[in-house]
Amino acid sequence: MSETEIKGILGTKLGMTQIFDEDNRVIPVTVVEAGPCVVTQIRTVETDGYNAIQIAYGEIDPRKANKPAAGHFKKAGVTPRRHVAEIRMDDVSGYELGQDVTVEIFEGINFVDVTGTTKGKGYAGAMKRHGFAGQGAAHGNQAAHRRVGGIGACATPGRVFKGTRMAGRMGSDRVTTQNLKVQKIDADANLILIKGAIPGVRGGIVTVKTAVKGGAHA
C-alpha cells in the first residue's frame, strides 16, 4: 500500500482521443469529466469505525429525489445529486459538509486507479466469455465445436462445482484498472486526461482515485 493520501472523485467517461507529448509522440488518452462533486457525509473512526468521505455527483431535479435521499442531502446543505460514492482515507480533518471536490485534487498526482462498469456483451458462450479453445473440428464431432465439454465428474462428487466456467452473461462487471498515468488536467473544464483505456462505455460513471500501488507520485 502506498503512503500517498487517498483522494477520489466521481466523473463521466467522455471518450478517447490522442495528444502529443514534448517529443511529438502520439499518446492515446481517455477524457474524463471529473466532478465537481460535493461532500455529503463525513465518517470518522469515533462514530463509524473508519475514516471516509461521501461525495455526490450529477445534478438532478430535486422533485425526483425520494424522501430519505432528500433528507440526507438537506442535512448536508446541498441540492440532491444523482450519484453517491464513499472514499476511504486516513484523515478527513480537511473536509466539511457541502465542500466542493474538484479535479484540482489530482494536481501533482502522476498515477490513478479508475473504477467503472465494463461494457455488457449479453449472453456469451464459453469460447468468447472465457477464451476456451473449443473442440476438435472433425473426427466425429457433431455440432459441439464451440461447446464447453466436461463440467465435472460423475457420481463423485455428483454435482457441478460453483464457479465452473460456462456460458452466461458477459460484461457489466465492476472493474478497476490500476496505475494509469495522468497526462493532463484542465481544471477550468473539469477534465482529466488519462493515458490508455478505462472501463466502461462513453457516458458511463467512473471513480478516479490516487493509485494505491506503486506510488501515485512515482
Curated annotation (Swiss-Prot):
Pfam families: Ribosomal_L3
Coiled-coil annotated spans: none
Gene3D superfamilies in UniProt: 3.30.160.810, Translation factors (2.40.30.10)
Keyword field: Ribonucleoprotein, Ribosomal protein, RNA-binding, rRNA-binding
Any Gene Ontology biological process: translation
Keyword Iron-sulfur among UniProt keywords: no
One Gene Ontology cellular component annotation held by this UniProt entry: cytosolic large ribosomal subunit
GO molecular function, one term: rRNA binding
Superkingdom per UniProt: Bacteria
Function according to Swiss-Prot or TrEMBL: One of the primary rRNA binding proteins, it binds directly near the 3'-end of the 23S rRNA, where it nucleates assembly of the 50S subunit.
Record's subunit section: Part of the 50S ribosomal subunit. Forms a cluster with proteins L14 and L19.
Protein family membership: Belongs to the universal ribosomal protein uL3 family.
UniProt-recorded name of the protein: Large ribosomal subunit protein uL3
Lineage: Bacteria, Bacillati, Actinomycetota, Actinomycetes, Mycobacteriales
